[in-house]
Amino acid sequence: MPISSKFNQRVRARLEEDEFEQFSGESTSDEGLEGGESVEDEEEEEENSAEDHSEEDDDEGEEDDDDDGDVEDSSSDINPSLNAISFGALAKAQASLGKRKRPTASTGGISPKRAKVPGRHSPTPSASSSGEKQEPEPELSEYQKHLAANAKKPPQKLTHRTSKHAPTIQSSRHAVSRKRTILEPPPVPKARDPRFDSVVLSHSTNGNSSTASNAAIHARKNYAFLDSYRKDEIAQLRKQVSTLQTKKHKTNYDERELARLKRQITSMSDRQRTFERKEMEREVLVQHRRKERELIREGKKSKPYFLKRGEVKKEAVAKRFTEMSGKEKQRALERRRKKVAGKERKEMPWGRRVVE
């Protein structure tokens, strides 16, 4: 139990074992007398200590080696005997002393805040006694030890994903970005042709879906000559490609121009093929609706059957295949076979892949 050295000096005269047993075993009737005697002894000791303190304040910086040796001997004798003192005796002794006086620098009771200031109330190395022990460093708590251990550890690297389909691994301590998009940028305006725009066509027909679809059909028929223009443009580009390929001495410009023309031909042909496929699907859907109306009109059906998008695509492919010639069918089948074989080869392990 930590007790100041000043408190030890006051109760030093009554810490003999025989006297302490007598003090703890006496009845309550004798406590008043002993309390009075102890109070008188303590008052005398307080006066003596006050005189000693005044003398120490007058002669500041001068300490006797004999007094230090006596204090060390007394503290060594008192410390083992303090373990046998009961809490009741300590409470009575503290109540008899009254208020504690503020410890001076000579008793070693300097507050930790004032002790931190260098050169203020701190004894010089020459004034400090040779036998004085240094205070041990405060022990760290388990939480502080845990923090210190984690601070020394290097950051752990995240393992890679098990496969490309697995989710990305990210630490739970990853800081979320504080940047927020307050105002969205305005969308980039897209080029719209009013002749083929569905919004313009529906507005011109007062929102009627049937008339809007009819208007779109009429617009496609009215501007069907654009398809012929596209075909003519693709034919002209192919002629330019053939002339560049037959050229003997090609420059870097010719090579770049040839690559650009090939890309343009591929893009335009794909776009033309997409238009034809959509037109074929639209025709299939129109024919199916016409058949359903006839069946309902004849009374063979009560509700029409609506084709799904996948069924429309299948019927459009079958119709396009029937309209092809013999050579075109062979080419289409060969392209289909190569496409399926390429997909199967990708799923095949490397050891079984053989170049045909």
From Swiss-Prot:
Location, primary (coarse class): nucleus
Basic and acidic residues composition-biased segments: 323-333, 341-356
Pfam families, sorted: RRP36
Key words, A-Z: Coiled coil, Nucleus, Ribonucleoprotein, Ribosome biogenesis, rRNA processing
Coiled coil region boundaries: 230-278
Annotated Basic residues bias: 154-164
GO terms of biological process kind: maturation of SSU-rRNA from tricistronic rRNA transcript (SSU-rRNA, 5.8S rRNA, LSU-rRNA)
Ranges of Low complexity composition bias in the record: 202-216
GO CC aspect terms: 90S preribosome; nucleolus
Subcellular location, record wording: Nucleus, Nucleolus
Ranges of compositional bias, category Acidic residues: 28-75
Chain intervals for the UniProt region annotation (Disordered): 1-217, 323-356
Subunit structure: Associates with 90S and pre-40S pre-ribosomal particles.
Family recorded in the similarity comment: Belongs to the RRP36 family.
Function: Component of the 90S pre-ribosome involved in the maturation of rRNAs. Required for early cleavages of the pre-RNAs in the 40S ribosomal subunit maturation pathway.
Protein name, entry field: rRNA biogenesis protein RRP36
Annotated source species: Blastomyces gilchristii (strain SLH14081) (Blastomyces dermatitidis)
